[in-house]
Amino acid sequence: MSRPTTIAVINQKGGVGKTTTVINLAASLSIMGQNNLVIDLDPQGNATTGFGKSNSEEEKNIYNLLIKKIDIRETIQKTEIKNLDLIGSHVNLSGLEVETANDNNRAFVLKEILSAEKNGLLDNYDNLFIDCPPSLSLLTIMALVASDELLVPLQTEFFALEGITQLVKTIDRIKENLNPSLKIRGILLTMFDKRNKLSSQVDKEARNYFKEKVYQTVIQRNVRLSEAPSHGLPCVIYDKNCVGSKSYFKLAEEFMKSGSIESAA
């Protein structure tokens, strides 16, 4: 059995569809038969609540895994979706940077945990998806160090390309100093509005700049994608026939066919 691929879903800017992508891509892949584990590394815990779980769960959370070093099996929760498990966030995660200030090895803690477990329990998974905070914090660095690949959601709005250019520079610094094998799996265009010329312009510019890194699938603006988290369900379960769900099922198919691509300088 091959080891799972660890994929961080990342953008230093908030509101780009990052958590929506984690939830619905992982759910789509699981519905298609793959085994997936979502790790919610964002203190806001939106991926956790998006699966109908609490980000104040006292035992089964990523904070206890990183700080208390408890057995990873004690942190994994089943979701309502077959083949899809979760290590949820916790409100205490926001204080992690202060709590680990004296640990010179703290950037590697998550990598060491996942690397050790990939020889055992985690081998049952095809993918480990990490939902990152929308900032370049210690938690984000931990995710970048622990990951094999990155998936970058890019909203088709003004200033989007400027932000992702800065992110690519950050990725290259991480590659140079902490994780030389890190690769970009793909860039996903989100919040696309075909009625808006700006969306089409950003789409064109992104494909001109990042070439084959950009997925052919685009995620259109869709109210059902926004509604689903309040029901504690991925949209692909909440309303599998809506435009947003169909886009994520299409992305899942493309994701399974695609390989990872070296980061641009």
Task: Please report, for each region that a protein language model flagged, where it lies by residue.
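P-loop NTP-binding core
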Residues: 1-265
